[in-house]
Curated annotation (Swiss-Prot):
Gene3D superfamilies xref list: 3.10.20.690, 3.30.230.10, 3.40.50.670, Histidine kinase-like ATPase, C-terminal domain (3.30.565.10)
Enzyme class name: isomerase
Listed result of changing S245N: In strain: JCM 6156 and PB4
Spans through the membrane: none
Primary location class: cytoplasm
List of residues binding Mg(2+) 2: D500, D502
Protein known as: DNA gyrase subunit B
Annotated site location: Interaction with DNA: K451, N454
UniProt KW keywords: Antibiotic resistance, ATP-binding, Cytoplasm, DNA-binding, Isomerase, Magnesium, Metal-binding, Nucleotide-binding, Topoisomerase
Keyword Transcription regulation found: no
Reactions accelerated catalytically: ATP-dependent breakage, passage and rejoining of double-stranded DNA
Gene name tied to this protein: gyrB
Misc. comment: Few gyrases are as efficient as E.coli at forming negative supercoils. Not all organisms have 2 type II topoisomerases; in organisms with a single type II topoisomerase this enzyme also has to decatenate newly replicated chromosomes.
Length: 806
């Protein structure tokens, strides 16, 4: 960590104007509908912490996705300055949080290098959050300030003492701005992984309280380590990663790391000033041209082209190549605001010159590595030639087929790809039902016999010789491979994988996804691939049958059924509560149960279910020992009354001296093993806790002496609302036969249309790639040649399996 220089309110330069942010958020943060703007909110805050790391003052960052879809970002940097800003008359922290383009990066002495995508600052995050809490640890004190929709609720105030320093920002994006507030683990992990590789030595912990998942990202070795990570579970062709880093006199910094592996796909990542370029740009063009030139020059010098009687191309050179190009440019030019493509012309020359120099030297100084790489390149050229011949054979056979389409394909009448659907169906029997049940105008059916080839393990020439793969390629019409592929010739823009809900169905679906991910990734990127979602249950009641789509719908159906002819009597003499009134109470109670289930990764339901019946604890009351002691006694009483065999609960108070509060802690002893659960201040301040106690208070106050539920002639005396609902659910379950549905072949054509193929009622999952690096690794681990990584994956994830079908 570097020594502290003067970093106070005088370092904060102000460029005013925040009014437009809420009116046109897309200009500042990206699309507010598709999730990109939502995730960029997190990246803006994380980038501030990375800037502290680049300045040498921070090496530990924590990002938490909370159960209510709020986000916390905490670092151990210097802490945002809290002294009064001379120009603005409020704390410097408040200036940073409320004024657009205010911050230390506009003062060259505070940050020499800074990241960030749009360069708008954390003030935009504040403006677009329904609530944001800023906590700063600095100069031995803890400072805190709360904002609602970007407006400070009170001045910055001291709330405790601390021996550490750093900044903690906890924000909840505004539902008024963002269409869908759901954070994707994959999108956040992808960016955080990149940042940890690009900033060696910085540790970033990503935690997801919704699922209990967490991952710590910290890598020494920069881009070299990044390439090694990308090639995990793959066999390298050149044993050592080629790497160079140079700072040129023209101000452009160039760093490249690369290594070939035994796969058949190229994986090139480009960055400018830590920002990824999805569409490449001038740095990629310079890299590709110099790579091909250097390798072809080496082949010519060694006389390998004549010896092997083959002509190599740039595509052959990049088969199985993993490479990262990172440039540092003082004033980069991009094709758009999202910076997906670099257009600075001077960067092409810089990358080309440095790559020519260093890579040519590498080939000459490492003859064994060079021969292995060139050997792979020549093999790729041979395979390309073999694939061309195989394609010609396929075309000759196809010429005999009048339509040029596979015989098994039942095509649709529609010729507009945007309106056409292709169902890839498992097996001929389900294919027959689908053909009879479909809408012939827009829906085409292609039955796939058996399991298609695993393309992860097969060379290109072998793959296109496979009958099932060949049939699929012909049906799609867009071709495959660099020479043949043309997305404009794709015959269907809706390709739907429809397989059974068993192990074989899952395997076939995985093989098809592997094929699309490896060979036709643009179809996935454009959102053309879908997975059909047939119903999960068939429910019989008497002679009536009904298909139900999933567990949530099943719970809804059974609840509705349980409430038929049911009534709740609040005491012995009270009139019955039934119909819409009872349904409303049940829905409120179910919403509480869902909240508790969501929280169960952090706090066991066996504890939190009692909070429904306990008085509310406010944040102020946490500081009152007597109040907390009385509340704790009630909790302990309930825990004792519900104690199960082999379990023991012991509740106590733990003092948090930093915040001057008393926190409930429960010791759970299960068969002699003790674990501890502490309910922290954030829990009692959360919306989830308030929802639980508010609805709990409402339901508890309803029931009096002699309360009971009744259904028909049967009745059950109850003390708590949950008792009554459980009894009604058990009663209705007895009257239903529930079958978990697995095979498409179990449905007749009409049922298949009504449940799975009718566009007005069907459910489908769109296949997307949010983290291409993680997707590459998972496909390689599960579908590749190496057995050991696959076994490790299965062993480490075995306990997470919720539905194992033998």
């Amino acid at each position: 960590m570097s020594e502290n220089q003067t970093y106070d309110s005088s370092s904060i330069k102000v460029l005013k104007g925040l009014d437009a942010v809420r009116k046109r958020p897309g200009m500042y943060i990206g699309d507010t509908d598709d999730g990109s703007g939502l995730h960029h909110m997190v990246f803006e805050v994380v980038d501030n912490s990375i800037d502290e790391a680049l300045a040498g003052h921070c090496d530990d960052i924590t990002v938490i996705i909370h159960t209510d879809e709020s986000i916390s970002v905490r670092d151990n940097g210097r802490g945002i300055p809290v002294d009064v800003h001379k120009e603005e008359g409020v704390s410097a922290a408040e200036v940073i949080m409320t004024v657009l383009h205010a911050g230390g990066k506009f003062d060259d002495n505070s940050y020499k290098v800074s990241g960030g995508l749009h360069g708008v600052g954390v003030s935009v995050v504040n403006a677009l959050s329904e609530k944001l809490v800023l906590t700063v640890r600095r100069s031995g004190k803890i400072w805190e300030q709360t904002y609602v929709h970007g407006v400070p609720q009170a001045p910055m105030a001291v709330v405790g003492e601390s021996e550490t320093t750093g900044t903690h920002i906890h924000f909840k994006p505004s539902a008024e701005t963002f269409k869908n507030i759901h954070f994707s683990w994959d999108i956040l992990a992808k960016r955080i992984r990149e940042l940890s590789f690009l900033n060696s030595g910085v540790g970033i912990l990503l935690k997801d309280e919704r699922s209990g998942k967490e991952e710590f990202f910290k890598y020494e070795g920069g881009l070299r380590a990044f390439v090694e990570y990308l090639n995990t579970n793959k066999t390298p062709v050149n044993s050592q990663v080629f790497h160079f880093s140079v700072q040129r006199e023209d101000g452009v910094g160039v760093e490249v790391a690369l290594q070939w592996n035994d796969s058949f796909n190229e994986n090139l990542l480009c960055f400018t000033n830590n920002i990824p370029q999805r569409d490449g740009g001038t740095h990629l063009v310079g890299f590709r041209s110099s790579l091909t030139r250097s390798l072809n020059s080496y082949i010519e010098q060694e006389g390998l082209a004549k010896k092997n009687k083959v002509a190599t191309t740039g595509d052959d050179a990049r088969e199985g190549l993993t490479a990262i190009i990172s440039v540092k440019v003082p004033d980069p030019k991009f094709s758009s605001q999202t910076k997906d493509k670099l257009v600075s012309s001077e960067v092409k020359t810089a990358v080309e010159q440095e790559m020519n120099k260093y890579f040519s030297d590498f080939l000459l100084e490492n003859p064994n590595e060079a021969k292995a790489v060139v050997g792979k390149m020549i093999d790729a050229a041979r395979a390309r030639e073999a694939a061309r011949k195989a394609r010609e054979m396929t075309r000759r056979k196809g010429a005999l087929d009048i339509a040029g389409l596979p015989g098994k394909l039942a095509d649709c009448q529609e010729k507009d790809p945007a309106l056409s659907e292709l169902y890839l169906v498992e097996g001929d029997s389900a294919g027959g039902s689908a053909k009879q049940g479909r809408n012939r105008r827009t829906q085409a059916i292609l039955p796939l016999k058996g399991k298609i080839l695993n393309v992860e393990k097969a060379r290109f020439d072998k793959m296109i010789s496979s009958q099932e793969v060949g049939t699929l390629i012909t049906a799609l019409g867009c071709g495959i491979g660099r020479e043949e592929y043309n997305i404009d010739k794709l015959r269907y823009h809706n390709i739907i994988i429809m397989t059974d809900a068993d192990v074989d169905g899952s395997h076939i679906r995985t093989l098809l996804l592997t094929f699309f991910f490896r060979q036709l990734p643009e179809l996935v990127e454009r959102g053309y691939i879908y997975i059909a979602q047939p119903p999960l249950y068939k429910v019989k009641k008497g002679k009536q049958e009904q298909y139900i789509k999933d567990d949530e719908a099943m719970e809804e159906y059974m609840t509705q059924s349980a409430l038929e002819d049911a009534s709740l009597h609040l005491d012995e003499s009270a009139p019955a509560v039934s119909g819409v009134q009872l349904e409303s109470l049940v829905n409120e109670f179910r919403s509480v149960m869902k909240t508790l289930k969501r929280l169960s990764r952090l706090y066991p339901e066996e504890l939190t279910e009692h909070f429904v019946y306990l008085p509310e604890v406010t944040l102020e009351q946490l500081g009152d020992h007597a109040v907390m002691q009385a509340w704790l006694a009630k909790l302990q009483e309930r825990l004792n009354s519900s104690q199960k065999s082999g379990l023991a609960y012991n509740a106590s108070l733990r003092e948090d001296k930093e915040r001057n509060v008393w926190l409930p802690e429960v010791e759970i002893t299960s068969h002699g093993l003790a674990s501890y659960i502490t309910f922290n201040r954030d829990f009692f301040g959360s919306n989830d806790y308030r929802t639980v106690v508010n609805i709990g208070a409402k339901l508890s106050s309803l029931l009096g002496e002699g309360a009971y539920v009744q259904r028909g002639e049967r009745r059950k005396a109850i003390v708590e609302f949950k008792e009554g609902l459980d009894w009604l659910m058990n009663e209705t379950t007895k009257r239903h036969t529930i079958q978990r549905y697995k095979g498409l072949g179990e449905m007749n054509p009409d049922q298949l249309w009504e449940t799975t193929m009718d566009p007005t009622v069907r459910r489908m999952l769109k296949v997307t790639i949010e983290d291409a690096i993680a997707a590459d690794q998972i496909f390689n681990t599960l579908m590749g040649d190496a057995v050991e990584p696959r076994r490790e994956f299965i062993e480490s994830n075995a306990l997470s399996v919720s539905n194992l079908d033998f």
